[in-house]
UniProtKB/Swiss-Prot annotation:
UniProt keyword Translocase, yes or no: yes
Gene name in the database record: ndhB1
Native organism: Oenothera argillicola
Assembly mode: NDH is composed of at least 16 different subunits, 5 of which are encoded in the nucleus.
Domain of life: Eukaryota
Membrane topology: Multi-pass membrane protein
Record carries keyword rRNA processing: no
Protein family according to the UniProt entry: Belongs to the complex I subunit 2 family.
Top EC class of this enzyme: translocase
Name assigned to this protein: NAD(P)H-quinone oxidoreductase subunit 2 A, chloroplastic
One Gene Ontology MF term: quinone binding
Reactions listed under catalytic activity: a plastoquinone + NADH + (n+1) H(+)(in) = a plastoquinol + NAD(+) + n H(+)(out); a plastoquinone + NADPH + (n+1) H(+)(in) = a plastoquinol + NADP(+) + n H(+)(out)
């Protein structure tokens, strides 16, 4: 009888332990519901692709778009919930991470309509393209919430592998193959450098991999001001620099922008920077909290080099995509100002606000380039001359997005830069802000040079590409124009919309 009762108690205890062990991942999984929706969408795409024919192509776009929209909805419903650390410290959910995840999902949602007509006209494989985009989005979302060194390494690799495949998607294009090889080789080298930096951080903290535990470990081992931490800081900065592409880690950017399919460039130009910015902010602010006197000057140098080199070299470019590549290098210099300022002076809020506007400005510009490229087959800046005489709507849309990128009032880019520079000035970064103001004026020069070409009416300057310009082969109302309209409207938002956006961004604390 006693043995029977003891046996029942043993079975009951074992059952409780098993249920707790099963309930933990199930409970944690409920907090990554937005990521789970994307995973379900990926599985659904694969299943439909393996059982369908070409007549089901619209379903691929519908499933991809609805997965992204549902993921955004789930993310918004989770807003303002208590921060949680999940999966034994591997992943963290809080407002700060979630707003970056929202920005990545927004980028992907706008990029898919950009790709529809492009894929139809170039006869690219559809399913694989959408799978790579969704998987890269998933990797970016996990990177935003990564809370330990292993996840911070694995998540960007998930994003990067899809990025390599997307950049080389047009296999018969020599420029695309060249861009992919450069991207792959430099990406592999940067990952190795990043892991080496992580190894120094791991050893210095006494074998800790979780970000907050690394800080505690550095305090316990008294290694927070050691040479090992300085070495880790340098290697990690170089590794993250490849993802952000500031100067001098920018060599891959112009070639990848020029050689990759334009919708891919539009996707990579914003999502990679958003995800890398979120990761860089957490890494510099948590494990390197005691080394701020070292990484502040390091990031200031990167910001100055990026703003000066990016904007000066952009003046000399003849390709629109290469010009935007160097422009993006300059733009990331402005974003770094927000990272340096930190949370105390509203730096993170200004950085998030500017990145939101940058998404609309940049994607709007790329939507115009995709549309013009499909109708003319050229990417040369000179071939845009006189576009206003043939397609005023496209010319005006491109002009507004470029002016917003340059930061002219009363467009959104002006207010984004104004808030970013003001936060930097309040934090005492006078020289850095002065360089930012100077390079912004330089960027306005080469943007206005393009706008002047768009509006020219002199026949001797109009190239055959514009003379023979027709709205075909695309439909008059197409998804590219839909994305373009949304981005143009968002790029021209007046300053009255700034206060609620900044208020939301200021709630994104760790």
């Amino acid at each position: 009888m006693i043995w029977h009762v003891q046996n029942e108690n043993l079975i009951l205890d074992s059952t409780i332990i098993f249920m707790k062990a099963f309930h933990l991942p199930l409970f944690d999984g409920s907090f990554i519901f937005p990521e789970g929706i994307l995973i379900f969408g990926l599985i659904l795409l694969l299943m439909i692709d393996s059982t369908s024919d070409q007549t089901d192509i619209p379903w691929f776009y519908f499933i991809s778009s609805i997965s992204l929209v549902m993921s955004i909805t789930a993310l918004l419903f989770r807003w303002r919930e208590e921060p949680r650390i999940l999966f034994s410290g591997n992943f963290q959910t809080n407002n700060f991470n979630e707003i970056f995840q929202f920005l990545i999902l927004l980028c992907s949602t706008l990029c898919i309509p950009l790709s529809v007509e492009y894929i139809e006209c170039t006869e690219m494989a559809i399913t694989e393209f959408l799978l790579f985009v969704l998987t890269a989005t998933l990797g970016g979302m996990f990177l935003c919430g990564a809370n330990d060194l292993i996840t911070i390494f694995v998540a960007p690799e998930c994003f990067s592998l899809c990025s390599y495949l997307l950049s080389g998607y047009t296999k018969k294009d020599v420029r695309s193959n060249e861009a992919t090889m450069k991207y792959l080789l430099m990406g592999g080298a940067s990952s190795s450098i990043l892991v080496h930096g992580f190894s120094w951080l791991y050893g210095s903290s006494g074998g800790e991999i979780e970000l907050q535990e690394i800080v505690n470990g550095l305090i316990n081992t008294q290694m927070y001001n050691s040479p090992g931490i300085s070495i880790a800081l340098i290697f990690i900065t170089v590794g993250i620099g490849f993802k952000l592409s500031p100067a001098p880690s920018h060599q891959w950017t112009p070639d990848v922008y020029e050689g990759s399919p334009t919708p891919v460039v539009a996707f990579l130009s914003v999502t990679s920077k958003v995800a890398a910015s979120a990761s860089a902010t957490r890494i510099f602010d948590i494990p390197f909290y005691f080394s701020s006197n070292e990484w502040h000057p390091l990031l200031e140098i990167l910001a100055i080099l990026s703003m000066i080199l990016g904007n000066l070299i952009a003046i000399t470019q003849t390709s629109m995509k290469r010009m935007l590549a160097y422009s993006s290098i300059g733009q990331i210099g402005y974003v770094i100002i927000g990272i340096i300022v930190g949370d105390a002076n509203g730096g993170y809020a200004s950085m998030i606000t500017y990145m939101l506007f940058y998404i609309s400005m940049n994607l709007g510009t790329f939507a115009c380039i995709v549309l013009f490229g499909l109708r003319t087959g050229t990417d040369n800046i000179r071939d845009y001359a006189g576009l206003y005489t043939k397609d005023p709507f496209l010319a005006l849309s491109l002009a507004l997005c470029l002016l917003s990128l340059g930061g002219l009032p009363p467009l959104a880019g002006f207010f984004g830069k104004l808030h970013l520079f003001w936060c930097g000035w309040q934090a005492g970064l006078y020289f850095l802000v002065s360089i930012g103001l100077f390079t912004s004026v330089v960027s306005i020069y080469y943007y206005l040079k393009i706008i002047k070409l768009l509006m020219t009416g002199r026949k001797q300057e109009i190239t055959p590409h514009v003379r023979n310009y027709r709205r075909s082969p695309l439909r008059s109302n197409n998804s590219i124009e839909l994305s373009m309209i949304v981005c143009v409207i968002a790029s021209t938002i007046p300053g009255i919309s700034m206060n609620p956006i900044i208020a939301i961004a200021q709630d994104t604390l760790f």
